[in-house]
Swiss-Prot record:
Protein name: Large envelope protein
Covalent lipidation (N-myristoyl glycine), chain numbering: G2
Record region (Pre-S1): 2-143
Source organism: Woodchuck hepatitis B virus (isolate 1) (WHV)
UniProt-annotated stretches for the region Pre-S: 2-202
Gene Ontology CC, one term: virion membrane
Domain description: The large envelope protein is synthesized with the pre-S region at the cytosolic side of the endoplasmic reticulum and, hence will be within the virion after budding. Therefore the pre-S region is not N-glycosylated. Later a post-translational translocation of N-terminal pre-S and TM1 domains occur in about 50% of proteins at the virion surface. These molecules change their topology by an unknown mechanism, resulting in exposure of pre-S region at virion surface.
Segments in the Virion surface topological domain: 2-209, 303-374, 425-426
Residue intervals passing through the bilayer: 210-230, 282-302, 375-395, 402-424
Keywords: Acetylation, Caveolin-mediated endocytosis of virus by host, Fusion of virus membrane with host endosomal membrane, Fusion of virus membrane with host membrane, Glycoprotein, Host-virus interaction, Lipoprotein, Membrane, Myristate, Transmembrane, Transmembrane helix, Viral attachment to host cell, Viral envelope protein, Viral penetration into host cytoplasm, Virion, Virus endocytosis by host, Virus entry into host cell
Length: 426
């Protein structure tokens, strides 16, 4: 039957017409009171039509008789129960409505009609049979079931969805007009819509992604060369400590492999000093990583993001352990508090210092184990109080060691700049 409507009639009964769906069921009076509620359908007396033309004529006349301006239509808030969905009696006759547009007068230019007719085949004209069309994906299985009971169930479910105001506005496309009734139409079973999803993603890389990848590779290569340069300069400085008069040529020559003259900081793999050179550079790399870790810890400690509990708390407040993730002052931002000594579901909450919690903790830990560090406290306080003298001392040290540091510091400049940016923006 394609997508044409199936309309069922009985010679001696009345056809109950369901609005906004386009399917007719025969009944003298609503047999199923739980489903066919009074007032939600239109009725008309039909003489049993013998031909398709008579059926079309009766439907058109019925449309013209309905006063669409005063018709209340399908109640918006009507809820249909999902019980007693019996199909029409088997004695009813089934006719198929041929496609023919039916325009309802009085409706705001809402198109009413049926699906276009199917293209006739060439099987009866002596030509070769038309190859069968591959079946389309069934997107509305509840509308095409052969079992009429399940068909009626899907019909009632779809009818309930049409009773909401949102579906009415989406159907008519006029958000500024209040359409309380759903205008009845004779329409076919909805055909599978053409699915228009997102466009397929192109497997090719976009220009912006390619530029970002190239820029990232360039940054990695730059940092790697700088790290190698830093390791080479530190290796040179380390080796120079053993030779105050200057670094001589490498004496670790291998008798089996003749190597040219070179410095101890650039030994080839065939030289006996090659393993010692890379051992020194491995230690240098570990020291650089340790320096970065210390910088990160100092930064987090200065921001107050390290939850380190003090050794000797000054204030105590007993709160519930589950709520001990906030500070004593009921602040939901760092610093947090520490929960110790849980007893009977409660604990002692000690506030963490706002900054330098790790430094204070390490200093207190060192003082508890090395009492002689207490002697340095007055000296440190004195150095902090005479900042001018400390500045002069620092200037003098830089002036004395400046020429020697100029050959070592340039490779560190990018790392210093990176540390400064991290310190400022984090």
């Amino acid at each position: 039957m394609g997508n044409n409507i199936k309309v069922t009639f009985n010679p001696d009964k009345i056809a109950a017409w369901w609005p906004a769906v386009g399917t007719y069921y025969t009944t003298t009076y609503p047999q199923n009171q739980s489903v066919f509620q009074p007032g939600i359908y239109q009725t008309t007396s039909l003489v049993n039509p013998k031909t398709q033309q008579e059926l079309d004529s009766v439907l058109i006349n019925r449309y013209k008789q309905i006063d669409w301006n005063t018709w209340q239509g399908f109640p918006v808030d009507q809820k249909l129960p999902l019980v007693n969905r019996d199909p029409p009696p088997k004695s009813a006759q089934t006719f198929e409505i041929k496609p023919g547009p039916i325009i309802v007068p009085g409706i705001r230019d809402i198109p009413r009609g049926l699906v276009p007719p199917q293209t006739p085949t060439n099987r009866d004209q002596g030509r070769k049979p038309t190859p069968p069309t591959p079946p389309l994906r069934d997107t509305h299985p509840h509308l095409t079931m052969k079992n009429q009971t399940f068909h009626l169930q899907g019909f009632v479910d779809g009818l309930r969805d049409l009773t909401t105001t949102e579906r009415q506005h989406n159907a008519y496309g006029d958000p500024f007009t209040t359409l309380s009734p759903v205008v009845p139409t004779v329409s076919t079973i909805l055909s599978p819509p053409s699915t228009t999803g997102d466009p397929a993603q192109s497997p090719e890389m976009s220009p912006s992604s390619l530029l970002g990848l190239l820029a990232g590779l360039q940054v990695v290569y730059f940092l790697w060369t700088k790290i190698l340069t830093i390791a080479q300069n530190l290796d040179w400085w380390w080796t120079s400590l053993s030779f105050p008069g200057g670094i001589p040529e490498c004496t670790g020559q291998n008798s089996q492999f003749q190597t040219c003259k070179h410095l101890p900081t650039s030994c080839p793999p065939t030289c006996n000093g090659f393993r010692w050179m890379y051992l020194r550079r491995f230690i240098i790399y570990l020291l650089v990583l340790l320096l970065c870790l210390i910088f990160l810890l100092v930064l987090l400690d200065w921001k107050g993001l390290i939850p380190v509990c003090p050794i000797q708390p000054t204030t105590e407040t007993t709160v519930n352990c589950r709520q001990c993730t906030i500070s004593v002052q009921d602040m939901y931002t760092p610093p947090y508090c520490c929960c110790l000594k849980p007893t009977a579901g409660n604990c002692t909450c000690w506030p963490i210092p706002s900054s330098w919690a790790l430094g204070n903790y390490l200093w207190e830990w060192a003082l508890a184990r090395f009492s002689w560090l207490n002697l340095l406290v007055p000296l440190l306080q004195w150095l902090g109080g005479i900042s001018l003298i400390a500045w002069f001392l620092l200037i003098w040290m830089i002036w004395f060691w400046g020429p020697a540091l100029l050959s070592i510091l340039p490779p560190f400049i990018p790392i210093f700049v990176l540390f400064f940016l991290i310190w400022v923006y984090i």
